Amino acid sequence: MKSILEQLSSITVVVADTGDLDAIKKFQPRDATTNPSLILAAAKNPDYIKLIDQALESSRKSLPAGFSESELIKETIDQVSVFFGKEILNLISGRVSTEVDARLSFDTEATVTKARKLINHYKSFGINKERILIKIASTWEGIKAAEILEKEGIKCNLTLLFNFCQAVACANAKITLISPFVGRILDWHKAKTGKDNFAGCEDPGVISVTKIYNYFKEKGFKTEVMGASFRNIDEIKELAGCDLLTIAPKFLDELNREEGELIKKLDEDTQSQSSIDYKFDEKDFRLSMLEDQMASEKLSEGITGFSKAIEELEELLLKRLSEINNQKLISTT
């Protein structure tokens, strides 16, 4: 009998949520997603030290004479993300998501500028922008930035998405793909209610993604829905049939080892028509987020967490730069 993973792959695009190249080789997904935390974890792996060194050297060459150490590290942050993305694209047939610096989440102009720069880095390697999804936090400013980028033909993946308002705002902006989170919503409800068991369709994260998916299909939105941030494989199975699901290697492994019948839970062909067309301007969006304690807290927490990961990656790069400079000094004495 086919594994649950094989069955899932026949009805949903399975995406690897990792920067670990070995895991991507093992599971051979169509697409892959990365974020600052995943890039940091991969960068800490001694197996990828050569890639880090290549990114540092490439950054040196791309900067004008007289650049500062801080300018070099800032440039290398972008290069590291692209170098990992390039290596991932060598292993998959589809797209990779590369995230804009989370510290720009409330700056539309800076986000647009950074996204264009990332795309140009990929272009320098001969990689078509059709294979790249620029990952941006689902703030109002992030959605507006993505709307600008989409009009330029730069496809975006709006992440840290925790409620219906964020999703609809993205769809109305004609964003290519959204990543509504599942597990982090579950975490919040567990902490607030003290209830530990939200089984199957009672899982609040599953309910959120299901609502978004059904509404998008009812209204004919082209924005793809990719469930993300899972805490167990039951959440994944409850969303079988979703456009895409991005899954961590440990859960891909579990799904690959499990057998049994997988039931398709989401189906775009069986949706009833809703009479309500939701629209959110900036005022409505901000009010909706303010009224949704879970979404507000989790969005803030996510941006803070990704920002800290970038800062830690900067420290790692500084340490490696110092090691390289010391090696060069020793070799010349």
Curated annotation (Swiss-Prot):
Keywords: Cytoplasm, Pentose shunt, Schiff base, Transferase. Coiled coil: none annotated. One of its GO terms (biological process) is carbohydrate metabolic process. One of its GO terms (cellular component) is cytoplasm. The keyword Cytoplasm applies. Its main location: cytoplasm. It is an enzyme of class 2 (transferase). The active site is at K135. It holds the Pfam family TAL_FSA. It is found in: Cytoplasm. Pathway: Carbohydrate degradation; pentose phosphate pathway; D-glyceraldehyde 3-phosphate and beta-D-fructose 6-phosphate from D-ribose 5-phosphate and D-xylulose 5-phosphate (non-oxidative stage): step 2/3. One of its GO terms (molecular function) is transaldolase activity. The keyword Membrane does not apply. Its EC number is 2.2.1.2. It catalyses: D-sedoheptulose 7-phosphate + D-glyceraldehyde 3-phosphate = D-erythrose 4-phosphate + beta-D-fructose 6-phosphate. InterPro entries: Aldolase_TIM, TAL/FSA, Transaldolase_1, Transaldolase_AS. Transaldolase is important for the balance of metabolites in the pentose-phosphate pathway. Homodimer. Belongs to the transaldolase family. Type 1 subfamily. This is Transaldolase. It comes from Prochlorococcus marinus subsp. pastoris (strain CCMP1986 / NIES-2087 / MED4).
